[in-house]
């Protein structure tokens, strides 16, 4: 007899979503997921907290078609004012505040990406890798290439603020 994954494995815990967060109509947020104030989950993204919790910090945006998933003993913790670019995958990892994960990047179990970091588009941050605060990292496997200067860090902050504004516009439209 075939087992039903959704009824046997997925938790009965419901997501905790801030009233100021935006979740697109066709995004999936399921299980032990917490979305902070002014956070956003854009179109087609999937956040599935079935084996461990997912915590998305205030002001963080999870863009179109991202996948955020966990593994046993590997929760996902994403800090505040983080931008997770289109199609990125976060799996059982930690991402610090004010960081940008580029489009199509993959961050694997146990990886730790610091605050004020830029992970380049298409990068692969391997299992248990550590990217220090203030780093530019890219490639497959991702390697730290340089430290970010204050201007680059300010751009990371602005990206998060821009997406907070866009999310609030989408939320208002969706609630009409």
Regions found by a protein language model. Give the residues of each.
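Glycine-rich hexapeptide-repeat left-handed beta-helix
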Residues: 2-16, 50, 56-58, 64-66, ...
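N-terminal segments that cap or nucleate solenoid repeat domains
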Residues: 4-41
